[in-house]
C-alpha cells in the first residue's frame, strides 16, 4: 500500500507539469490575427457559388442589336414559347447556383410591369400585356433551388429625364420595385456603361453624365442594404464584388480580392486594374468574370454557329474560378423565349468535362507535414 501511495503522490506534479506544457503549447499556436480586409459571410457564400448564369433578353432580341436606342415599339417583344422553367432547368443541370436577369438594359425596356413607365412588357402582346417575366423567373428559380439576381442598367436611353436629378428618383423607385416584389435577391448588378446618345423621350440627343457623382451611389447602395441586406452589390468597383476588367472570360493569374474601393466607381476608366485587384487594397472586393457563350450578349441567329468551343468553356472555368473569381456565364435567350439548343448542348458538355476533371482526387494518399498544428 505504501508503494502505491507514493507512486500516486508523484503522479500529481507530473500531471500538473503536462497540463502547463500543453497550455503553453496551445498558446504558441493560437490563430493569428487577420491581416488586412477579410470577407463577410455573404461574400464567402457568394464565392462558394462558383458558377451562375447571366440572362440577356429584351427588345434587342427581336431587333437583332446589342444596345437598343430606346425608341423601339414595345409590341416587338413577342416570344412565342417563353419558358423560364426551361432556363432554370438548364442552369440547374449544369451545376449553376443562380441566375441574374437583365430586368432593364440600356434601352430602358422593362421586363416587369413597372408602375413608373409605360415602356415595358405591359405594352407588349406577350401574355396579353399582363405578364411579368421577372416574377416567372423568380418562381422558376425557387422551383429549381436557384438564387435570383437582378441587373438594372443605370443608363436609360428611353427616359426623358435621364441626366437630371429627376431620373435618379425614377431609377431608385424601379430599384425598390425589383427588390421588394420578387423574394430574396442574391446579387444586384450595376453596369458601368453610362451616358451617350439616346431617344430620351423623343429629343434624340447625346447626354453625358459624371459617372462618379451623378447616381449618388452611396445613397443608392443604402436602398439595397435596407431592402436586401444579404445581396451582393456588383459594379466596376464593388462595393461587394467587382468587374474583372474584360468580357473575354478571364481574370489575372495574380488576382487579389482586395481593392482600394474609394478610388473606383461604376464606369471607372482605368478598368484594366480590375483584372488583378490591388495588393494594398483597403476593402475585400473579389472579382466576378462575366462572359457570353456567344460573341454577343443578346441572341442573334447569325451566331448560332459561333458558340464557344468546349475547350474555351473549360479554359474559362479555370481562368475564373481557378483564379480566385466567380464565373458568370451569359446565356442569350432566343426569339422563342428559350435557351437555344446549341447553347444547351455546349453547357452540358462543359459540365461533363469538369465532372471528369474532378472525379480523380489527386491529393488522395498524399502525405502532409506541418511544423505546427492547433
Model-derived regions: residue spans:
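Sec-dependent N-terminal signal peptides
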Residues: 13-22
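Mature catalytic domains of secreted/periplasmic carbohydrate-active enzymes
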Residues: 29-374
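Positively charged n-region of N-terminal signal peptides that target proteins for export
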Residues: 6-13, 91
Amino acid at each position: 500500500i505504501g508503494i502505491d501511495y507514493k507512486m500516486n503522490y508523484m503522479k500529481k506534479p507530473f500531471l500538473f507539469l503536462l497540463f502547463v506544457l500543453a497550455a503553453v503549447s496551445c498558446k504558441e499556436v493560437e490563430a493569428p490575427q487577420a491581416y488586412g480586409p477579410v470577407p463577410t459571410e455573404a461574400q464567402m457564400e457568394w464565392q462558394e457559388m462558383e458558377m451562375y448564369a447571366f440572362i440577356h433578353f429584351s427588345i434587342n432580341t427581336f431587333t437583332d442589336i446589342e444596345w437598343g436606342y430606346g425608341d423601339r415599339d414595345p409590341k416587338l417583344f413577342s416570344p412565342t414559347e417563353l419558358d423560364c422553367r426551361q432556363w432554370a432547368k438548364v442552369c440547374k443541370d449544369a451545376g449553376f447556383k443562380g441566375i441574374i436577369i437583365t430586368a432593364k438594359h440600356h434601352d430602358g425596356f422593362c421586363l416587369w410591369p413597372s408602375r413608373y413607365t409605360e415602356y415595358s412588357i405591359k405594352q407588349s402582346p406577350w401574355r396579353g400585356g399582363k405578364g411579368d417575366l421577372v416574377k416567372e423567373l423568380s418562381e422558376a428559380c425557387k422551383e429549381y433551388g436557384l438564387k435570383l439576381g437582378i441587373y438594372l442598367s443605370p443608363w436609360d436611353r428611353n427616359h426623358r429625364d435621364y441626366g437630371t436629378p429627376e431620373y435618379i428618383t425614377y431609377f431608385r423607385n424601379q430599384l425598390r420595385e425589383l427588390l421588394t416584389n420578387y423574394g430574396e435577391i442574391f446579387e444586384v448588378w450595376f453596369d458601368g456603361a453610362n451616358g451617350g446618345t439616346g431617344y430620351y423621350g423623343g429629343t434624340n440627343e447625346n447626354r453625358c453624365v459624371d459617372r462618379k457623382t451623378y447616381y449618388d451611389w452611396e445613397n443608392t447602395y443604402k436602398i439595397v442594404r435596407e431592402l436586401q441586406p444579404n445581396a451582393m452589390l456588383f459594379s466596376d468597383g464593388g462595393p461587394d464584388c467587382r468587374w474583372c476588367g474584360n468580357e473575354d472570360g478571364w481574370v489575372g493569374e495574380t488576382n487579389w480580392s482586395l481593392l482600394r474601393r474609394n478610388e473606383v466607381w461604376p464606369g471607372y476608366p482605368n478598368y484594366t486594374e480590375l483584372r488583378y485587384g490591388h495588393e494594398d487594397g483597403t476593402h475585400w472586393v473579389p472579382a466576378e468574370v462575366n462572359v457570353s457563350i456567344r460573341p454577343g450578349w443578346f441572341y442573334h441567329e447569325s451566331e448560332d454557329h459561333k458558340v464557344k468551343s468546349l475547350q474555351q468553356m473549360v479554359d474559362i472555368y479555370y481562368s475564373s474560378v481557378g483564379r480566385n473569381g466567380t464565373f458568370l456565364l451569359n446565356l442569350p435567350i432566343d426569339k422563342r423565349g428559350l435557351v437555344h439548343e446549341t447553347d444547351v448542348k455546349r453547357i452540358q458538355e462543359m459540365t461533363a468535362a469538369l465532372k471528369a476533371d474532378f472525379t480523380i482526387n489527386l491529393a488522395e494518399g498524399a502525405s502532409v507535414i506541418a511544423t505546427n498544428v492547433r
